[in-house]
Amino acid sequence: MYKRQGESRALAGYPVTPPALPRPVIFDQRWTDLTFIHWPVLPESVAGSYPPGTRPDVFADGMTYVGLVPFRMSSTKLGTALPIPYVGTFPETNVRLYSIDNAGRHGVLFRSLETARLTVVPLTRIGLGIPYAWSRMRMMRSGKHITYHSVRRWPRRGLRSLLTITIGDLVEPTPLEVWLTARWGAHTRKAGRTWWVPNEHKPWPLRAAEIAELNDELIDASGVQPTGDRLRALFSPGVHARFGRPCVVQ
């Protein structure tokens, strides 16, 4: 469970639980079998990638971070009751930075999102300004071992990502790991404006993840250059997430 506000100086004032979700609920879905891998990044090296009205979110150590996050998405609905046809269950892998806006909302800024569902790509690119890419993807699990594999089809055909992990024991997240995983929305750019797309979910149940193989081209292709050692990897069986009504940031 996440630490309460005030238990760590590094998290003082940080929203470790989601604020009230603006209604109506736009999407409802499950994220499962998810792995978090993170590297530190100098904030000034990525500041130019952020849309107007946002900037790199910086932890108490003076660094921002880039994440490689593969998982499986399922049970996507419009609102809370209407399943979206032709979507079903499919793997995704996202590369994300961490953002904050002038209203103090801490979110993520996606640099890319790999998906095996072609129909998702134009809908999210046009409708939400989220940079989805169409990829050939596989996710294989055998007991405590999971392999995530993707090969980009469009755009920038051929980009690859391969990750194999072994799931370990339950862990108590550090303040930095809370800061990285307790994110209640995404900043996007659409139609010349910056948007906040809010979400809510319960705290991530987190386990250690031992990396057996990591061969990734997506981080480099995103234009982000890590500046230090990789953090410990984390695995989660998943959460149920809801997205609320987007609002304009600037």
Cite the ranges covered by each PLM segment:
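Short, small-residue-biased leader/transition segments that mark boundaries at the very start
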Residues: 1-2
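N-terminal, charged low-complexity regulatory/assembly segments
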Residues: 10-11
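A short, surface-exposed helix-loop junction/capping segment
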Residues: 19-30
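Glycine/small-residue-rich interface belts in oligomeric ring/scaffold proteins
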Residues: 27, 43-93
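Short amphipathic
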Residues: 32-38
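Internal, well-folded beta-alpha domain core
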Residues: 94-250
